Structures are given as structure tokens and as C-alpha cells.
């Protein structure tokens, strides 16, 4: 199974903490970067300053329109969420869709877990937060196009989880690359999810900036 070690420099985390102290959600910083944070849980993320934000409010409004089973309960459990893209044309609907995007979409979501979810959570359930990745990996279910690029355990001060990157899609359609980092808090009460995705070609063209975003993701904890 392909594996790619994910490393983070402590100096980057210290820089983020220093820049973000005193703000719950921040979108300011150096000439080249902006910072998103959720201070109550010590969650930080650095992105290019020029990227456009899809706000928590717009995401909540979009999610409230879902009629899927359990959608209302999942939405109610969200503590905070925000999304970004270099394109101002990306909407909240695009964020929640699994359809291909020609522009990178970065989505950060923090939500509480129910008692039932806490008892059932596992590394495989963390992998399956967006698509049934664990079954694609073990072959119990298949998809026409699937390549696992990375699948590594992640340890943060505030929790632990798994980072995965993979390419998937229908046989005759454009494939997309999805990178996800899913962290379970130390008390097993909260899930921190960072998802980055776009078409395979788009991801290859933007991999340097997306790699930096993924490396900046920090869950410091309460």
C-alpha cells in the first residue's frame, strides 16, 4: 500500500499560534497568507491570502436545504466550518458536492460526536468520512478508477487520526484527487475534518500550495 510520511515543522505551528492568539476566526496575516482559526479548540489553518472564503453562514444555509436522512442531525452537531477556493465562483453548494471541480476547494469542519458515534469510531470510519475509502482500500467494494497516494496516521496535541490522499472517479469521466485529514479529539467528543479536492490535473498543478495548506493544519486542543 502506498504511503507518504506527513511531516510538520514545529516552527510553523508556533508561528500560527503567535499570529492567531486573541481571535476566534482570523483572516489576516502576511502579504502572502491568510489564517483561519477556531480558538476554542486550538484549530489553525494557513492559506494563500488571495483565496476567497465561503463563510460559515453560507455553508450552514446550504446544509439546511438537504433532505438526506440524518442531515439535520449532522448539521446540528457542527461547531464550526469554513471553506476556501482561489475562485470566487465556487459556492457553498460546490463545497458539499462530490462532483469534480476545476478549481481547488478546501473545506474545514469541526463537529461534535454523539455517544453512539464515539463508541463506533475507528480509523476506518475516519477514512470513510467523505467516501467509502476503507472498502476501496481493502477491495470489499470497487470503483472504476482508484489510486491510493497516501494513507498515514496523524498525531496532534489535541487528538489523533488519519491523513489520506487518493484519486478516484468513473471509468469514462475525469478523475479527481481528494486529500483528507480527519482527527479525533483526545476525549473522543469532537471530529476535525480538513478536505481538499479538485480534478486530478488541477491537483497536480496546485499540489505545492495544497501541500502547504495540509501541513499547516493544526489541532492544538482545548
Regions found by a protein language model. Name each.
Residues 2-16:
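Bacterial N-terminal signal peptides that target proteins for export
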Residues 24-27:
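C-terminal motif of bacterial Sec signal peptides marking the signal peptidase cleavage site
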Residues 33-46, 133-137, 207:
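Short aromatic-glycine motifs in intrinsically disordered, low-complexity regions
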Residues 40-63:
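Proline-anchored loop/turn motifs at beta-strand termini and strand-loop-strand connectors
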Residues 42, 123-127, 200, 204-208:
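Soluble non-cytosolic domains of exported or imported proteins
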Residues 51-53, 134, 188-222:
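Surface-exposed amphipathic alpha-helical segments
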Amino acid at each position: 500500500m502506498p504511503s507518504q510520511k506527513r511531516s510538520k515543522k514545529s516552527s510553523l505551528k508556533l508561528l500560527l499560534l503567535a499570529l492567531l492568539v486573541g481571535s476566534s476566526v482570523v483572516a489576516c496575516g502576511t502579504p502572502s497568507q491568510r489564517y483561519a482559526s477556531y480558538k476554542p479548540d486550538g484549530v489553525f489553518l494557513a492559506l494563500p491570502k488571495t483565496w476567497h472564503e465561503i463563510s460559515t453562514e453560507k455553508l450552514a444555509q446550504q446544509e439546511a436545504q438537504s433532505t438526506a436522512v440524518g442531515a439535520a442531525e449532522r448539521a446540528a452537531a457542527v461547531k464550526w466550518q469554513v471553506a476556501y477556493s482561489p475562485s470566487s465562483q465556487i459556492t457553498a453548494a460546490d463545497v458539499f458536492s462530490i462532483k469534480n471541480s476545476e478549481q481547488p476547494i478546501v473545506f474545514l469542519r469541526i463537529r461534535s460526536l454523539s455517544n453512539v458515534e464515539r463508541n463506533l469510531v475507528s480509523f476506518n470510519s475516519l477514512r470513510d468520512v467523505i467516501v467509502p475509502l476503507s472498502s476501496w482500500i481493502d477491495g470489499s467494494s470497487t470503483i472504476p478508477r482508484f489510486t491510493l497516494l497516501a494513507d498515514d496516521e496523524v498525531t496532534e496535541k489535541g487528538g489523533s487520526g488519519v491523513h489520506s490522499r487518493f484519486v478516484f472517479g468513473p471509468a469514462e469521466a475525469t478523475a479527481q484527487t481528494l486529500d483528507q485529514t480527519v482527527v479525533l479529539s483526545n476525549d473522543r467528543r469532537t471530529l476535525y475534518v480538513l478536505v481538499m479536492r479538485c480534478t486530478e490535473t488541477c491537483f497536480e498543478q496546485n499540489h505545492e500550495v495544497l501541500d502547504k495548506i495540509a501541513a499547516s493544519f493544526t489541532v492544538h486542543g482545548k
